Swiss-Prot record:
It is a multi-pass membrane protein. This is Aromatic and large neutral amino acid transporter 5-3. Its main location: membrane. Residues 1-24 are annotated as: Disordered. The gene is ApiAT5-3. InterPro entries: MFS, MFS_trans_sf, SLC43A_AATransporter. Gene3D superfamilies: MFS general substrate transporter like domains (1.20.1250.20). It catalyses: L-tyrosine(in) = L-tyrosine(out). It is found in: Cell membrane. The lineage of its organism: Eukaryota, Sar, Alveolata, Apicomplexa, Conoidasida.
Length: 504
């Protein structure tokens, strides 16, 4: 944040340790990509930790001044508006099969089918040939890659341009993407750029909402959890568009998509123009507790003993990025991302009996998200990461018994297990980094993981193409192996965290 007021109130009377804990609670409930802005909300730099108690007394008066809200609106009206904003501008593409069904019915990429290869016996919203299925699902890879890669840009945009400009930029990308998507056809093949704009705009549009939690002193974690829940519920957008397009007589693909742009994103645009502030509402200040003061002193002593109190930015990044606490996190996150992004558009092949149920189950992923966040606060983040990965591991095992597709009952269990894992897909990275590292490099570390992970996840495209041509058994076994590798990485991370709770 660039405003003086916002900067002043962020210097809270809170130790680095307790500050990290508070952030882990808040971020535990966010199911989406992260950017550089994460280190800006209620977390100061590590070097500021010793001076926070002194700064708090100076800034207490500013913190007690209620933030100014446009038109004098009640903070609860703002909360409702922000929740609807999160729902309508959220990562709805993650419930990909609903969007894929609409694309199949519209005839997208049907021109890729070879002469005489079109299967006329399938339903209108099912793929007509393998080539069409591969091309449609390639769009999911493009959107998810763009979503993760541009997450860091969303954070930078928020930090340097402010909430309103960041929200308007994100919405401009979303409106452009969905408009191109609606107009795309065989004669105007704009599907790929549409997906790029869609993915790029999601976090840029969302991050400005974070300062809205500052309107509720003492309830910041709860409000962030509510935002995260509505972003998960945004999966209903794709399901609603699919339902209208398939079941309403006379509905066209272009009309349905542009209707969402006008009604859904149009509402979000009004919120961004008239409610989201130019400068972030300041974080609520709190008086330092005795334990917080002790934590500050202990942290300062530890830094002094290690001789790292005055590290340069480069030295600080080297310390964090090359630490044994961070290095295993990178392959872990990449492997999780690959398995999830392979499964999402392949559900029709892997769990055909639970295919439509999976579209609904995915919407309720906000429930385990909140529960896992609470567990992370009580037991630490690594045990929660183990729970998530074990859900993924069990799902891949079930998918292979007795073959693909597996037992019908198992397919519903797989859908639930995958939804649990997806609900905390990126939030576990937020929590792990904030719990173990000081805030000075949080945005860089999380942005790096999301961006590089998003690029590497492009490998899921050839994985799906191979599976469509040769069967899904081989790649399913590969995903099972990835989950087993992650169990080993998590065990190392658990032992390491017990030995080194905080990287100093």
């Amino acid at each position: 944040m660039e405003s003086t007021e916002a900067t002043m109130v962020e210097r809270k009377a809170e130790s680095p340790s307790s500050g990290d804990r508070a952030r882990s609670i808040e971020l535990a409930h966010q199911p989406t990509g992260a950017g550089a802005s994460l280190s800006s909300f209620e977390v100061g730099g590590a070097k500021q930790g010793v001076n926070k108690a002194q700064d708090s007394a100076v800034n207490k008066g500013a913190a007690n001044t209620p933030p100014r809200v446009a038109f004098g609106l009640s903070r609860y009206v703002v909360l409702v508006a922000y929740c609807l904003y999160c729902l309508l501008s959220g990562p709805s593409f993650m419930n990909w099969t609903t969007i894929a069904d609409s694309l199949y019915k519209s005839g997208a990429f049907e021109w890729e089918c070879k002469p005489g290869e079109i299967d006329t016996s399938v339903l209108p919203h099912e793929p007509k040939c393998p080539e069409q299925e591969v091309s449609v699902n390639h769009l999911f890879t493009v959107a998810s890659c763009s979503y993760f890669v541009f997450a860091m840009l969303g954070g930078i945009m928020l930090d340097f341009a402010g909430p309103k400009f960041g929200a308007l930029t994100g919405l401009a990308c979303l409106i452009t993407g969905w408009t191109l998507f609606g107009f795309s056809s065989e004669s105007f093949r704009a599907y790929v750029p549409a997906m790029v704009f869609m993915g790029a705009g999601i976090d840029m549009a969302f991050f400005p909402c974070l300062c809205g939690a500052n309107l509720f002193p003492g309830m910041v974690a709860t409000i962030i959890a509510v935002y995260g829940s509505f972003r998960s519920i945004s999966f209903i957008v794709g399901l609603s568009l699919r339902t209208i397009y398939i079941n309403v007589e006379g509905a066209t693909f272009r009309g349905v998509m542009l209707g969402y742009v006008g009604a859904g994103l149009g509402f979000c645009l009004l919120v961004a123009l008239f409610i989201i502030p130019r400068r972030a509402w300041p974080a609520p200040d709190e008086a330092p507790s005795a334990s917080a003061e002790q934590d500050v002193e202990a942290g300062a002593d530890a830094l002094a003993q290690k001789g790292e109190k005055n590290l340069t930015a480069i030295q600080s990044m080297k310390r964090d990025f090359l630490s044994l606490s961070f290095l295993p996190l990178f392959p872990y996150f990449v492997l999780v991302l690959i398995t999830i992004l392979f499964f999402a558009p392949s559900a029709k092949r892997l769990i055909p009996s639970a295919y439509e149920a999976n579209q609904i189950i995915s919407i309720f992923s906000f429930v385990p998200c909140i529960i896992l966040g609470g567990i992370a606060d009580r037991l630490g983040i690594v045990p929660v990461m183990m729970i998530c990965n074990t859900c993924g591991l069990l799902s891949w095992i079930l998918m292979l018994i007795p073959g693909i597709p597996c037992f019908a009952a198992s397919q519903y269990i797989v859908s639930i297990l995958i939804s649990i894992q997806m609900s905390f897909l990126v939030s576990q990275v937020y929590c792990y980094v904030t719990e173990i590292f000081y805030p000075e490099n949080l945005g860089k570390m999380i942005g790096f993981l999301c961006s590089v992970g998003g690029i590497i996840s492009l490998v899921t495209d050839p994985m799906r193409k191979y599976s469509v041509d040769n069967g899904f058994y081989t790649m399913t076994v590969l995903c099972l192996i990835f989950a087993l590798i992650n169990e080993g990485l998590l065990l190392f991370m658990y032992v390491r965290k017990r030995k080194v709770p905080k990287v100093l």
